[in-house]
Amino acid sequence: MSTIPSRRSFLRNLAGGAAFLPAAVATLGELRPLLAATVGAESRWELVRRQFAFSEAKVPINAANLCPSPRAVTEQVVHFTHDIDNDCSFNNRGKFKKLLEESRGKVAAGIGADPDEVALVRNTSEANNVINNGMPLSKGDEVVIWEQNHPTNNVAWDVRAARYGFTVKRVTVPQNPKSEQELVDAFESALTSRTRVLSITHVSNLSGIRLPAQAIGLVAQKRGIYYHVDGAQSWGAVAINVHEMGWDSYTASSHKWFCGPREVGLLYVKQNRIKELWPNVVAPDWGTAVDTALKGARKFESLGQRDDSRLAAMGTAADFHAMLGAPAIEARMYALVQPLKKGLQDAGAKLVTPMDEKVSGGVCIIEIPEEHRASMVNALYDKHGIAGATTGGLRLCPHLYNTMEHIERAVAGVKDLRKWLA
C-alpha cells in the first residue's frame, strides 16, 4: 500500500497549523519576516520545506549526493541566465566580477575564513585534486589518508604516487567507534617522520562516521604535517569555523548539503599555505607571468569561461544558510537523522552508521545484501516516494527541507520492504 502522502499525515499537519503557513516565496527578503513570525519549531521547518519545489510524491532523502536548491537560489540562477542570454556583451557581463566577490565574501564568512582564502571552483572533486596535484611531493615522502575517503581524495593519491614515487598509507577505523579519542588514536598511530600530508574526510559517505576533525588536526599541526579535510558531507550540514578548527585546507560542493547552484565547489586554503600549492589549471585571468596577478586562493579558480549565473547565485545560497543559522541547521539535521536511525533499527534493519551522534553525521546507512540494494531503493522510490541511494546498503540522508513525516514514511517504507533486509 502506498504512503504518498496519507490522509492521516495531512490531518496531523492541519491540526499543527502547518496547513496555514504561507506558501513559498521567491526572495529571501520575503522569507525573513515570515520565519520571524512563525511560532513553533516544526512550523518553522515546514515553512523552510515550502521553499523547495519538490513534490510530496517524490521526496529526496539523499543529501550526500544531491540536494534541491531553495526557490530563491533557483530564481537567481534563472534571472542571471536570462540576463546573459539577452545581452552577452562584455559591457553587460562586467557586473559579474563584483557579484562573484560578493558570493566569495558570504561563503567565506559562513565558514569563518577570509575571502582571500576561498576559491569557488566547480566541485569537491576538482578542489581535492588541487590539493593532490598542487602539493610538492617526491620519493621518500608519505601521505596518510582514511580508507573511506572519496576517490578524489583516495585513489587520486595513488595515481599521483605512481608518477612521483611517494607512498600512500591508509587508516582503518572501527565500524562502531567507542569514542572520538579512539578515532584520533587511529590516525595518530599511523603518522611517521616521513608523513608530509594527512588527508581525511569529515563525514564518510560510505559509513556515516563523523571524524573528530579538529582533534585530529591538532595532532597533525604539532608535527608540522599538512592537514586536508574533505567536507563534502559537512559543509551546509554542520557548523564550521576553519580558523578555529586549524585546518590547512577544506573542500566541498555547493550541490550537496549547501543546497546551492550545481557545478560550484568550495576550496578553502589557509593563508600561509596558499603559496606552497601549485594550481591545476592556468587560464587567461592568471596573467602573463609565472607569479599570478590573482590574489590569494583565487589562483585555484583560474579555469576559463564559467557560468556566471551560478557563481552569482552562490551569495543567495549563503544568505539562506546564514538566515537559518548553521547551529540550527545542524541541530535540525540530528533531529531528523537520529529518529530515522532508531526507527530503521526498530523495523529490523542493521545500522552501518553509529547511533552515537558524536561520531556520526547526517548520513544514515543500513545493511542490505548487494543483490537486493537496487530493488530496495527502486521500490522505496516507486511505492513510498522516498529517494535514497544504494551506497553501502541503503543510504538515507535527511536535511533541512525534510519533515518528520518524511522520516516516518521512510521508516514505514523500509518496514514494508523488509524482505530485502537479509
Residue ranges and their predicted role:
Residues 2-422:
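Pyridoxal 5′-phosphate
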